[in-house]
Regions:
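Short beta-strand micro-motifs enriched in acidic
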Residues: 108, 200-202
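Zymogen propeptides
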Residues: 1-117
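Electropositive phosphate-/nucleotide-binding environments in soluble metabolic enzymes
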Residues: 39-42, 161, 189, 193
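Active-site-adjacent helix-turn-beta-strand microarchitecture at beta-sheet edges
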Residues: 66-178, 183-184
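C-terminal structured interaction module
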Residues: 194, 203-204
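Generic recognition of flexible, low-complexity loop/linker segments
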Residues: 45-46, 153-156, 184-188, 196-198
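Short glycine-rich loop/turn motifs
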Residues: 10-15, 102, 162-164, 193-198
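C-terminal soluble interaction/assembly domains
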Residues: 207-209
Length: 209
């Protein structure tokens, strides 16, 4: 647990470290792969913990309810099955449409870990080493594809969780909340003090929550 003050502000923060040479990382999510909403009930961290007594359970991703259905706005992959995708459009006025790439933290089939940005079209699901250059202050960037942003490849993961923004990538400060369109109309308030959860991995394969 953190001290009562961090960088001059009051804080209640916790950190947990898992050595992935012996630990297991898993997720739970509603199944909304069709992005049409589901009657699957959301679960609290306490409910997930009670089923398996995990040493550490943390909330993750973005989600909401509407019209009697539950929706996920963030990628979720478990045992190589995609349960939900990151959102693939956003707008401030529902006239001008943007197509943001959103963050993902994933484990590959070989046990390697990575942070990336993802986008799902109707026919394909891509992952990128950098985000699409979107900002609410400019016209929408091109819709992501196999060739934009550069370095795109077909998405593949054994386990993954979306949300965002990416804060650190390859050891460098990134914080792509502008490109991921988390400011402004999103209501996320990335530059304000709010409860947050973060996940990352060290070079020696220790997951940090």
């Amino acid at each position: 647990k953190s001290p009562e003050s961090l960088e001059g502000s009051k804080a209640v923060a916790y950190i947990a470290v898992a050595d992935m040479s012996s630990a297991q990382w898993d997720i739970w999510s509603i199944n909304d792969a069709a992005m049409e909403g589901t009657e699957d009930a959301f679960r609290t961290p306490s409910e997930v913990y009670s089923e398996a007594s995990w040493p550490i359970v943390a909330n993750a991703g973005f989600f909401y309810s509407s019209g009697g259905k539950n929706y996920s706005s963030s990628l979720a992959v478990r045992n190589s099955e995609i349960l939900a995708y990151n959102i693939n459009y956003a707008s401030e006025d529902w006239v001008t449409m943007y197509y943001p790439t959103r963050a993902a933290f994933l484990e590959t089939e070989t046990g390697a870990f990575d942070a990336c940005w993802t986008y799902r079209t109707w026919d394909n699901h891509y992952m990128y080493p950098s985000p699409a250059e979107n900002t609410w202050d400019a016209k929408p960037a091109d819709q992501p594809s196999a060739t934009y942003p550069e370095g795109g490849e077909e998405f593949a993961a054994r386990t993954a969780i979306g949300g965002g923004p990416v804060l650190i990538n390859d050891g460098k400060f990134t914080d792509s909340y502008v490109e991921e369109l988390f400011n402004g109309a999103s209501g996320i308030g990335p530059d304000s003090a709010q409860p947050r959860t973060a996940i990352g991995v060290t070079v020696d394969k220790k997951i940090v929550l």
